[in-house]
Swiss-Prot record:
Stated family: Belongs to the GroES chaperonin family.
Gene designation per UniProt: groES
Keyword Cytoplasm: yes
PROSITE patterns per UniProt: CHAPERONINS_CPN10 (PS00681)
UniProt-recorded name of the protein: Co-chaperonin GroES
UniProt keyword list: Chaperone, Cytoplasm
């Protein structure tokens, strides 16, 4: 678990994952500083914390396909957004992760 996630004391349940979207540059290519309202949500996010795991019909915990520290691709509308100490995070289900970026 990353230091950042440890200080948050957030433990997602089931097959949910706590991620932090990558920050978009606040300056456009031409050097213009963009206001927050002009920025778009990033599709890339870093995996910070894994949930307790999804269970199969026999009660066995299924392994996650992602690991802490992975950079993943998620839909810009995926998950539940939350703000803790001024930092924005998203809790998504593993099925909302479209790819792991290498």
């Amino acid at each position: 678990m990353s230091d950042q996630a440890t200080t948050l004391r957030i433990k997602p349940l089931g097959d949910r994952i706590l991620v932090k979207r990558e920050e978009e540059d606040s300056t456009a290519r031409g050097g213009i500083i963009l206001p927050d309202t002009a920025k778009k949500k990033q599709d890339r996010a870093e995996v910070l914390v894994l949930g307790t795991g999804k269970r199969d019909k026999d009660g066995n915990v299924l392994p996650f396909e992602v690991t802490v520290g992975d950079t993943v691709l998620i839909d810009k509308y995926a998950g539940q957004e939350l703000t803790v100490d001024g930092e924005e995070y998203v809790i998504v289900q593993e099925s909302e992760v479209m790819a792991v970026l290498k």
